[in-house]
């Protein structure tokens, strides 16, 4: 299977990330990983998310900051009234700028620059780097040794965060 973009051909016989193979029971147990049971991400002054790991469900429960209440509130799916949860969180830092001359809040992300990446799963965190060869290529995430990170199967929350917000990012 191939996909044509701008008269270029790229093989897309893989998933967006390198997911654990369900056929073999493969899993990233996050052995030796630092604790990543709570995660706080500031995207901007008005957009903040937090996640808390639920060891029973093996997922991260999502909350968003409400300027009205002044506190974090559960992020709930309108269709089923359940709190959103994710098996993996991927936080990627990148240079983000406003489009020149744009009067709204449209952002331009430098996707091909790469940057720091934090992968959270099973209550742990792996620090590494993300890269994209071009806007048309898939995003790749590598650990400190240069090996491509293995993501556990399930829903993955991907956050692209401005480098300027790095000091407001925390986990424990």
What spans do the regions from the language model cover?
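A surface/extracellular/periplasmic glyco- and lipid-processing/surface-interacting theme
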Residues: 2, 6-172
